[in-house]
């Protein structure tokens, strides 16, 4: 019976999330990774600076037009855009309105991309994303 309830909760939650309206983004709004630069070789931990044009930054839970908060995708493709951004080691949330983060990464190549989301962690419509960058973390 517990398994049935767990499955029901997952199915219902996914269906409800898919029904949430996405916040509109102004035309031309875009996220950028200011630093590190694409192709950079860096040491870990890595300081990642977030940029945003055409919108403002607001903490998660604060519903204000034309604002959102950053999510840093690490070695991950864009998640489904009609659902809240997952919270795991590949989808880092910055729900306090941070515009910079210090991220510990293993040595090797890594792909980073920013995705802005609204107060409910839903990506905007159209999505506000950065171009992905690739960095190499050197072995120390």
Language model segments and positions:
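Beta-strand signatures of extracellular beta-sandwich domains
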Residues: 69-73
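A glycine-anchored, Pro-Gly-centered beta-turn/N-cap motif
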Residues: 44, 68, 106-108
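Short beta-strand elements
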Residues: 126-140
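Short amphipathic, basic-aromatic surface patches that mediate peripheral association
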Residues: 51-62, 122
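Short, well-structured beta-strand segments within conserved domains
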Residues: 46-50, 99, 108-116
């Amino acid at each position: 019976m517990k398994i049935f309830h767990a499955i029901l909760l997952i199915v219902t939650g996914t269906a409800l999330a898919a029904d949430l309206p996405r916040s509109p983004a102004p035309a031309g709004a875009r996220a950028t990774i200011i630093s590190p630069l694409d192709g950079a070789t860096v040491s870990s931990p890595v300081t990642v600076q977030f940029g945003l044009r055409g919108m403002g930054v607001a903490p998660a839970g604060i519903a204000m037009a034309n604002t959102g908060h950053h999510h840093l995708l690490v070695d991950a493709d864009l998640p489904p855009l009609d659902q809240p951004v997952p919270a795991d080691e590949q989808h880092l949330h910055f729900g306090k309105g941070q515009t910079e983060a210090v991220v510990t990464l293993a040595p090797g190549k890594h792909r980073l991309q920013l995705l802005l989301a609204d107060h409910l962690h839903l990506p905007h419509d159209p999505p506000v994303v950065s171009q992905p960058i690739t960095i190499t973390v050197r072995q120390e």
